[in-house]
Amino acid sequence: GGDFDIYRGDAFQLVVAQPQHSIAAAVGLRLALKAHASGVDVRMSVAVGEAQFRPSEVKTGTGDAFVLSGRGLDNIKPHHLTFCSGEQTLDDKTQLLTRFADSHINGLTQTQSQTLLAYLEATDKSHESVAAILDKNRSNVSRILNASNYKLIAEYLDYMERALILWVQGGTSLKTEQLTKED
C-alpha cells in the first residue's frame, strides 16, 4: 500500500508503506507504462528514509526520503531510475545494480514489458500460468521472457528487497553475506 499525489499534470510522488517494496513498485510502474504504449516511460528517483506527510498531501511531505528523492531526480538524466538511502554502505551495494537494471529496462519493448510485468506480478511463476494470464501460447511467452532477461530482473528485485529489509531492521553495516540469497 501507499499514498500518492499527482501535480503539474506530468509529475507524481508516491510513498510506499514498506520500504522493501519501493524498488519493485518503481520497476512495476515503469513496466506498466512501457507496456501501455510504445515510447512511454517515466523517470523515477527512489529514496528510503524518514518521511513526514499527510496522506492526502504527499507533495508537501518532508524528511530524508523526500530530500534524497528530490536530489536524485535533479541528477537523474540520462537515467530513468535511481536509488538512494543516504547510507553509504547500502548505496554502494545498490546504485550500480540499479543503473544496470535501469539500462536493461530502457531497452525492453512494449511486449517484453507487458510479459515481464505479468511474470513479476504472477503468484504462479510458471510460463504456462503467465501465458494463460496474457492469453498467449507458452512457447511465445517463454521466448519473450528469455529475451527480456526476466531472471536477472527478478534476482535484482529480490536482492533489493533483502537489502532494504536489512536496512529497515537497522543494518547499518550491510555485509555481502547478508545479501546473498540462500537456496
Show which residues each predicted segment covers.
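DNA-contacting interfaces and partner/effector-binding or oligomerization modules
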Residues: G1-G70, D74
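Flexible, glycine/charge-rich interdomain/linker segments that couple
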Residues: F53-T60, I76-R99
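Short, Lys/Arg-enriched anionic-surface-contact patches
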Residues: K93-T111, L164-W167
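Short alpha-helical "packing" element that flanks the helix-turn-helix/winged-helix DNA-binding module
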Residues: Q114-Y119
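Flexible coil/turn residues that form the inter-helical turn or adjacent wing/linker of helix-turn-helix
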Residues: A122-T123
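Short alpha-helical "recognition helix" segments of helix-turn-helix
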Residues: S126-D135, V141
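Intrinsically disordered, low-complexity basic tails/linkers immediately adjacent to helix-turn-helix/homeobox/MYB/SANT
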Residues: A154, D158-D183
